[in-house]
Design a protein with these regions (language model features):
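Metal-dependent de-N-acetylase/amidase catalytic core
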Residues: 1-4, 77-248
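Active-site rim/loop-helix segments in enzyme catalytic domains that contact anionic ligands
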Residues: 1-94, 118, 122-127
């Protein structure tokens, strides 16, 4: 049984067909409380149950505010506790793969999924392979190693029905359908991650520019930055798993 790690409830819709076919254990980092109380998390739980998937040990563990505070404060103990909890699940289940939100530079909590999943695999000492799927970018993968799921008409219709049914609370749905078109979501792709510690390019990620705009508008107090916040957390995770591996 594979595992899936997503940053926010609602992301599972992007892999609706894959979940329906594979019945994964699904972990959700946040409860999306910044947007709609716990309504989104409840809908995610209902959908997973209907699709035959199972809730993971981490399921809406953090509020959105707590997740962003963890990054801004470089709260390594909290992040390590999440990694350790996921590692325990991986060690118990020995899944062939874990799939997570892609690190696209769009949202730092999305990007955390790569770090948490990769560190958990190493901490657990399992042979689980790490994969990602596009959250914001086009769902078709160009990676030759990608696993591609082509949905049939019934699967695609079920996916679109679920997505449109949640459009009122998931504001990104309409934007994504407008940007990519409904037909783009007939295909789902997960692609392998060779190095979970890869830092990305030199260009500032989109979440930095977005954060700067929000700070200027007095909506945020501080900007989350890759070099100042994300990379120190990555380095702390890498050091922790290396220390653990040296102890055995």
């Amino acid at each position: 049984m594979p595992h899936l790690l997503v940053a926010h409830p609602g992301h599972e819709l992007l892999l609706h067909g894959w979940i329906s076919r594979n019945k994964p254990v699904v972990h959700v980092l946040t409860d999306a409380s910044a947007h709609s109380s716990d309504a989104r998390l409840g809908r995610t739980a209902d959908l997973l149950r209907d699709l035959g998937a199972r809730k993971g040990a981490i399921f809406g563990r953090l509020s959105d505010a707590e997740a962003y505070a963890m990054i801004l404060e470089r709260n390594t103990p909290l992040l390590l506790s999440l990694v350790a909890e996921l590692a325990a699940e991986l060690e118990k289940d020995q899944p062939a793969i874990i799939v997570g939100d892609a690190a696209e530079g769009y949202n730092p909590v999305h990007d955390l999924c790569r770090l948490i999943a990769g560190a958990a695999i190493e901490m657990a000492g399992v042979a689980t392979k790490q994969y990602e799927y596009a959250v914001v970018n086009h769902p078709h993968a160009n990676d030759s190693g990608a696993i591609v799921i082509n949905l049939d008409a019934v699967e695609h219709a079920a996916k679109m029905e679920q997505a449109r049914g949640q459009a009122a609370t998931l504001t990104d749905i309409d934007a994504m359908l407008s940007r990519h078109g409904a037909d783009a979501f007939r295909t789902e792709a997960i692609y392998p991650i060779a190095d979970w510690t890869a830092a990305g390019g030199d260009e500032p990620p989109l979440y930095e520019r977005y954060g700067e705009e929000r700070v200027a508008a007095h909506r945020y107090a501080q900007v989350i930055r890759r070099r100042e916040h994300m990379l120190p957390l990555r380095d702390a995770l890498r050091a922790a798993v290396e220390k653990r591996s040296c102890a055995f």
